[in-house]
């Protein structure tokens, strides 16, 4: 495990499948209790909600203790010799492919490489990536791991998955640095947190893309994202904005909801806000 010591309390959340959760808990809760005691952290897994295909592991304590505990979790999951699962719930499928024989010469070493799905708020993901990817590149080179962030938000939230692949000790060491990065960039209180998602919600979702000219995007988002956040709450939808403009210099607002009516309402409100902003600017001329 990493040797750096940090005493400030940190909290990390990890996305796990039902099968992974069972392995982490262990018979009569013995495995998770052992991790809890050896790392001196608070660690637990969310209740198994009916219809949900995932659970969330939460761990809090010192940066080093949390990193060690999560490294131990990766080690426990590596002991499963069965073939990797393919999940119908897409966020559970790993983004990174398994390491190839050309990357790791020793077959026994390959078995010790694991993957971690760290849940991070969207605003903090950019802090991990850094300017032009400089920070994420530094993490990869320093710790000998692979790190990638999901492009999409987790359903009904403003959280994304930061996936880390490597040896358990290397992942733990990387987590210490990530904890420092996140401590310097606190998560905004208004961002919606992810909770285990039911399969029926995912399968029955409705999505609509709305192209918005780049020059109006800031106005539609509002200060600190408050305008689009209000739209989300009122219509009970998820709204994701593309990072880069398309060839027509538009950014795409992707609206997702559990039914056609809520998505249509969000689309109508968004376009009405656009027309209002256009009119406001024309009146200024």
From Swiss-Prot:
Residues 9-73, 113-178, 205-270 form the KH domain. One of its GO terms (molecular function) is RNA binding. InterPro entries: KH_dom, KH_dom_type_1, KH_dom_type_1_sf. Signal peptide: none annotated. Keywords: Chromatin regulator, Chromosome, Cytoplasm, mRNA transport, Nucleus, Repeat, RNA-binding, Telomere, Translation regulation, Transport. The keyword Repeat applies. Pfam families: KH_1. Binds RNA. This is Heterogeneous nuclear rnp K-like protein 2. The gene is HEK2.
């Amino acid at each position: 495990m990493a040797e750096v010591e940090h005493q400030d309390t940190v909290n990390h959340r990890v996305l796990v499948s039902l099968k992974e959760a069972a392995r982490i808990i262990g018979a009569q809760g013995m495995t998770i209790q052992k991790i809890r005691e050896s790392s001196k952290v608070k660690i637990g897994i969310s209740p198994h909600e009916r219809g949900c295909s995932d659970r969330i592991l939460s761990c809090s304590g010192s940066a080093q203790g949390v990193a060690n505990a999560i490294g131990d979790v990766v080690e426990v999951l590596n002991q499963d010799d069965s073939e990797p699962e393919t999940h119908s719930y897409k966020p559970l499928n790993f983004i990174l492919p398994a390491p190839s024989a050309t990357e790791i010469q020793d077959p026994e070493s390959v078995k010790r490489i694991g993957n971690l799905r760290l849940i991070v708020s969207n605003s903090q993901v950019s802090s991990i990536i850094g300017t032009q990817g400089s920070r994420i590149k530094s993490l990869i080179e320093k710790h000998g791991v692979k790190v990638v962030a999901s492009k999409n938000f987790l359903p009904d939230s403003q959280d994304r998955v930061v996936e880390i692949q490597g040896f358990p000790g290397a992942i733990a060491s990387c987590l210490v640095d990530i904890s420092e990065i996140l401590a310097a960039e606190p998560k905004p209180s208004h961002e919606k947190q992810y909770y285990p998602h039911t399969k029926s919600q995912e399968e029955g979702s409705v999505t609509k893309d709305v192209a918005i000219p780049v020059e109006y995007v800031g106005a539609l988002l509002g200060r600190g994202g408050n305008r689009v956040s209000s739209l989300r709450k009122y219509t009970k939808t998820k709204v994701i904005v593309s990072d880069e403009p398309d060839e027509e210099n538009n950014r795409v607002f992707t609206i997702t909801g559990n039914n056609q009516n809520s998505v249509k309402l969000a689309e109508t409100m968004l376009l009405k806000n656009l027309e209002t902003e256009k009119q406001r600017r024309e009146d200024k001329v």
